[in-house]
Amino acid sequence: MIEKNWQELIRPMKPEIEPGHDPARQAKIVAEPLERGFGMTLGNALRRVLLSSLQGAAVTNVHIDGVVHEFSSIDGVREDVTDIVLNIKQIALRMHGEGPKRVVLKKSGPGIVTAGDIEETADVEIVNKDLALCTLDEGAEIRMEFTINTGKGYVPSERNRPEDAPIGLIGVDALYSPVKRVSYKVENTREGQVLDYDKLTLEVETDGTVTPEDSVAFAARILQDQFQIFINFEEAVEARPAEDDKPELDFNPALLRKVDELELSVRSANCLKNDNIVYIGDLIQKSEAEMLRTPNFGRKSLNEIKEVLAQMGLHLGMEAPNWPPENIEDLAKRFEDHV
């Protein structure tokens, strides 16, 4: 059966999100277990797409009143126009709808002009409002009109200044990608008694216009869409086994549930994972004394697990005849509606 090419590969659990110092911009996304070699394959593909192919919005050109070209200076403004344009490139924004759109900034001195001084519209939202653009002296004024568009990747300033552009329109390098940095690492992890599966950790930093978790989801969707063209067959729909076809079990089907499906605290869940306790059937055979010998597992975690098991009519120290079954993963899928 051709379906075995993909159905018999191990599939990772739902990715674990580890927020960074600024959760809206930084996070680690962890996926495990993966077939050996898949960590590098998926990590490299996702990284390339994250950095090159996600849509974003950016300033494409700017007109500053009284300025003829980008090598000018402005009376009462401490920065020259070149520095102002460099700062404009760092504006992070969201655009709702199609571009291009225009927004205006007007301010009088003294004081610092920030991205938050840009007059937002229903279509344009400034994310990093604290970004400094320039500094005005007493009595100085500045007015800037920005053109904003959507795109992907990098577009140089020369392409953002039309040939028939009026004097004073300055092209800006457009950095459309909302993802600023991506790195990944692949480590060994275990599943059951197998020790050489891959664990993929993606470390993603964005400009705040999209979360790291969403950016990875968008990149995965792009890859899914691109890979789809290579599939040249239709999958046969397998009939779901009838109730009478299910094998009789020598134990409670609830034992086939994985412990990571239980609503446990992070500490308790990590302790079980580190002790290679995968299924509830593995857990109930442990005594309280054995559990307390688990590193970082204390009385609070023990009471939490006892309470969860009690709600299922189970407890620690139980016997589970014929556990674990040889085809445990297959049984877990077939009995998933009953556990």
Swiss-Prot record:
Does the entry feature the keyword Nucleotidyltransferase, yes or no? Answer: yes
Catalysed reaction equations from the record: RNA(n) + a ribonucleoside 5'-triphosphate = RNA(n+1) + diphosphate
What is a biological process (GO) this protein takes part in?
DNA-templated transcription
Which top-level group of life is the source organism from?
Answer: Bacteria
- InterPro entries assigned: DNA-dir_RNA_pol_insert, DNA-dir_RNA_pol_RpoA/D/Rpb3, DNA-dir_RpoA, RBP11-like, RNAP_asu_C, RNApol_insert_sf
Question: Which top EC class is given?
Answer: transferase
Q: From the UniProt record, which GO molecular function terms apply?
A: DNA binding; DNA-directed RNA polymerase activity; protein dimerization activity
Which Pfam families does the UniProt entry name for this protein?
Answer: RNA_pol_A_bac (PF01000), RNA_pol_A_CTD (PF03118), RNA_pol_L (PF01193)
Region listing for Alpha C-terminal domain (alpha-CTD), in residue ranges: 251-339
Alpha N-terminal domain (alpha-NTD), as annotated region? 1-234
Q: Which spans of this chain does the record mark as coiled coil?
A: none
Chain ranges passing through the membrane:
none
Keyword terms of this UniProt record: DNA-directed RNA polymerase, Nucleotidyltransferase, Transcription, Transferase
EC code: 2.7.7.6
List the GO cellular component terms: cytoplasm; DNA-directed RNA polymerase complex
Query: Does the UniProt entry include the keyword Acetylation?
Result: no
Q: What does this protein do?
A: DNA-dependent RNA polymerase catalyzes the transcription of DNA into RNA using the four ribonucleoside triphosphates as substrates.
Record's subunit section: Homodimer. The RNAP catalytic core consists of 2 alpha, 1 beta, 1 beta' and 1 omega subunit. When a sigma factor is associated with the core the holoenzyme is formed, which can initiate transcription.
Relay the domain remarks: The N-terminal domain is essential for RNAP assembly and basal transcription, whereas the C-terminal domain is involved in interaction with transcriptional regulators and with upstream promoter elements.
- Which family, according to the similarity comment? Belongs to the RNA polymerase alpha chain family.
This chain belongs to the protein called: DNA-directed RNA polymerase subunit alpha
Annotated source species = Maricaulis maris (strain MCS10) (Caulobacter maris)
Gene name, Swiss-Prot/TrEMBL:
rpoA
